Regions:
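Exposed beta-strand and adjacent loop surfaces of beta-rich binding modules
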Residues: 67-69, 119, 167-169
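Internal helical hairpin/lid segments
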Residues: 91-144
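Catalytic core of DAGKc-family lipid kinases
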Residues: 1-103, 109, 116, 156
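Well-ordered beta-strand positions enriched in small/hydrophobic/aromatic, beta-favoring residues
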Residues: 68-70, 122, 160
Length: 201
């Protein structure tokens, strides 16, 4: 069940097989406590300076957080993203950023995003937007604000079929997986759990 307004997120558990992860994609296949990447930054777990080996060995106390993922169907293959999907390039042409988390490359892009709200956050940059305007927008995002511009659009969805004017590179959690002119996305609520030390909550 996705989080409701005013509810506490997750629950305290004891678990012995938690693994510290250093990139966003590994949380899909492991009992992960991310310490690097945009997921770690979103949940406030990116400041770990050393591994708590005893906690891992003894099944120490963790806060278990249910987490949505984005499922993407493209060119007959299915991929899952824990953090984000990028289509195209920020500095030229058509570009789309599809996020499950508030952060992208360490910057808060989506102010109201929550990784367990059952929604995908989307930022669309139209292909005709000039380089100077793109750079200004990126600078504003780095400062935690947005540049209003008719060729920038921010919206939410739970499922979408996206058609592009030409084949574009598609990056899943920072890794290029294919090139396509069509992408089908949907959110899978509560798809995985991630873990942060219970004293962080």
């Amino acid at each position: 069940m996705v989080i409701a307004k005013g509810e506490e997120w997750g629950e305290r558990v004891r678990k012995s097989d938690v693994v510290y992860t250093r990139n966003d994609h590994d949380v899909l296949t492991l009992s992960a406590s991310p310490i690097k990447g945009d997921i770690a930054r979103t949940v406030g777990n990116g400041q770990q300076k050393r591994l708590d080996v005893e906690k891992l060995k003894t099944g120490g106390a963790w806060h278990q957080l249910p987490f949505d993922v984005i499922e993407a169907d493209v060119n007959g293959a299915t991929f899952r993203a824990a953090a984000h999907i990028r289509v195209g390039h920020f500095l030229w042409g058509e570009c789309h950023l599809l996020c499950n988390v508030a952060m992208f490359r360490g910057r808060r892009v989506f102010q109201k995003s929550h990784p367990n709200d059952g929604k995908i956050e989307v930022l669309t940059i139209e292909r005709d937007m000039k380089l100077r305007q793109r750079l200004l927008a990126i600078m504003r995002v780095r400062k935690g604000s947005h540049l209003p511009h008719p060729q920038l659009k921010i919206w939410q969805t739970t499922a979408e079929v996206m058609h592009f004017q030409r084949p574009l590179p598609i990056f899943i959690d920072g890794v290029k997986v294919t090139t396509s002119d069509t992408l089908r996305i949907s959110v899978i609520p509560d798809a995985i759990n991630i873990y942060i030390p219970s004293d962080h909550k």
